[in-house]
Amino acid sequence: MRMPTNLQHPNMTAIASLPRSQNALKIVSPNTFHVDANAPLPTLVDHDSVLIRVVCVAINPVDGKSADLSATAGATSGTDFAGIVVALPPDTNSEPDDDALKIGDRVMGFVFGNNPQGRDNGAFAEYVTVPRRLLWRLPAHMSLETAASLPASLASVGMAMHYLQIPLSSLQSAISKSIASSSAAAAADDEGPFVLVYGGGTSTGCMAIQILRLAGFVPVTCCSSSSAARALSLGAAATFDYASATCGRDVREHTHDSLALAIDCISDSASMSICYEAIGGGGGRYVALDPFPVRGCVRRSVVPDWICTLTQFGRPVAWAPPYNIDERPGDRRFAEEWYRLAQRMLDAHVIRAPTLETRTGGLASVPEGISEVRMGEVKRKKLVYNIVEQKAAA
């Protein structure tokens, strides 16, 4: 078989036929999109790239934020997807590993959409390419809709723990122990170190609470009163209303002035201030999911940092400042190990997905969802779209 020109790779294993073009949601200008019905398929940049036929996609805040702050005209949008493997790197089937990916496998992943250096690749399209070591295979119990809601949060929590300087070896050991205990709830106790998760009602906050419990930490969270019950059910030891004037002080008292680690899933001046107030007198580390306001660095004993999960690919991020980031090979190395560990959690069925709202209309309906998420109109749920439903029904 001859691969389409832009997909050629020596000895690549693929399904019998692939189209020469696809439908893809392209960025036209800041927060303006259109469906290109004749878009090229993504180029296989890495020697270990996998081509996936996308079935479901989910919307993340970064999809609208990046298209607003650093729009790349002609780039495919989207980060979270789930689909079916249709082409593999040449040496995959020769690997002795029984867990090696195979054509037809159901997978999910997080991709660099709106990429100035890879405009043909993004989740909001019929095909996407991702390095094989940065993919998760779906467990039998998981639907493609559910899977599409998980990758960005799962990848971001891992990167946040990496930037908190929690050793990977300790994560592997503790999570293995929790998996052996069947669930985070069965393994949970309140004797480990506290970690504050600010934004426990967000998708990433909910994921962080679960994984921190599995890793032997005691998560406490700042969230709205309407998110508190779910946060507790996911493993939070305590919740604190971020609207309270004493929120930071209350966290500090509850944690006996011992809190040393904080993950800020909101990352604005107010959230940073509360995190800094909550961290104990001995100081600690604060990691935000976005650039933090420098004026918020009011304690020398607290070391601040922020993550851009796109660094997991080991390539530069060429967005507008402050999101112009040189490649970070260490983040790629960590991510590959983290994905292996997270696969074990997925297989063990110890991760709960967010509440989903599955919408119809395919790619053409996605811009409306991006706008709703960007405007803060979507609360405590994830928007998911099945982009092949209309063709499947035809």
UniProtKB/Swiss-Prot annotation:
UniProt-annotated binding residues for NADP(+): V62, D63, G64, K65, S224, S225, S226, S227, Y242, L289, D290, V378, K379
Entry EC no(s): 1.-.-.-
Record-level Gene Ontology MF annotations: oxidoreductase activity, acting on NAD(P)H
SMART domains: PKS_ER
Transmembrane stretches, start-end: none
Functional note: Trans-enoyl reductase; part of the gene cluster that mediates the biosynthesis of fumosorinone, a 2-pyridone alkaloid that acts as an inhibitor of protein tyrosine phosphatase 1B which is implicated asa negative regulator of insulin receptor signaling and a potential drug target for the treatment of type II diabetes and other associated metabolic syndromes. The polyketide-amino acid backbone of fumosorinone is first assembled by the PKS-NRPS hybrid fumoS.
Name recorded for this polypeptide: Trans-enoyl reductase fumoC
